[in-house]
C-alpha cells in the first residue's frame, strides 16, 4: 500500500510507502496486521473480519534512542508454527496443548536494525514481545517509556478495577487487593486517578470480549 503526495506548483512528486504484514491464527479467524505507516510502528487485530483492537502504536523510548517513530518495517518475516504440550499442576486446565503461529517482525531506523516484535497468534489469543538488538558497543539499555497502546473500538465498555493509591490499606500495603469495579462502564476514565489494574476486561458490544493482561 502506498500514498502519493504531489506539490504541483514546483512539479515535485514523491511517494511514501507503508509496509504492512499480516499474521493469522491457525484457524484463520484472528488476524494481526503490523504496519510502519508514517514511520510509526503499529498493529491492529480483527476476529472474523471484525475489529477488536484498532490501529495501536508499538515502540520503545530508551536511553540510547527514541524507537517509537521514524521506524521502518523490514520486508523479510520469519514465520513458524508453534505446537507445544505442557503440564502445570496449579491451574484449572493442568494439561495444555498450545498451537499458534509465530511471526518475527524486524524494525529498523536509519538503516540499523533496532528490535524485533515477535507475535504469537493462537485460535484464542494474541501475545507479543520486543527483542532489542545491541547498538555498537552498547549491550544493554534502559527503557524509559513504552509506546505500546491498545485502542479499543468505539462503543466498547469496561470491567476494570481501579488501581489503589500507594501506601494505604492494611499495614500500608496498597496496592495489594482487588478493588470494586463497575460493569459495562464507559471508556475514557481514570479510575481513582492511578489508572487500572491488569488484567483488563472489555466488551466489544455484542461482538465479543477482549481481555488484556
Language-model regions, residue ranges each:
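N-terminal accessory beta-strand-rich subdomains and adjacent acidic, glycine-rich linkers
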Residues: 22-213
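Boundary of Sec targeting at the N-terminus
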Residues: 18-19
